[in-house]
Amino acid sequence: MFSYIHQNFNLDNTAAIHMASKNKNWSNMFRLSATLNEPVDVDILQSSVNEISKRFPTIISCIKKGFFSYYQQSLKTPLLIEKETELLKPMSNKTLANQAIRILYNKHLIHIEFFHAITDGKGGIVFLKALIYEYLKQKENLKINDSTILKAEALPEKEELVDAYTGITTNFKYKAKHNTKKTFQISD
């Protein structure tokens, strides 16, 4: 079931850099994959994506251009999984305005392609683990008690939805110690 509160988010500092550096020669995409022991059940994979969407509103999202800058928006409609085609197919600004993530499948493989502005590698792995857990829970009635797997029924923590770099830089106090003696002097 696909349902959650539609939200807008400011891009964090790193995401803004990815948007500024994006061009036709560098797509800022990365892919994570999982290999299953049996063929992917497409209906269960789609159901799993729908189920975890509310848990990851900043990943199941698109990137829109605002008046002054880009912003992130959780998807209003379900993210549809696709059969794998081209590896890391670039995302144009038009594509990003609709979705900044692709979930692909092919035989025994599940791939997730992320536009780097929505998450980094660690966030991608957290998302992949949650998706695979939800898939196995629905397919095999599997239950795993592992605190590193974020469950679909939990809501995101406030800290997950803000720019972590802001807290790091505002709490950082550094005072340079300068040598006040001149090392050389030019004279007439």
Question: What residue spans do the PLM features occupy?
Answer:
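Flexible, P/S/T/G-rich "lid" or insertion loops adjacent to the active sites of thioester-utilizing
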Residues: 159-188
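Non-catalytic N-terminal regions of enzymes
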Residues: 1-164
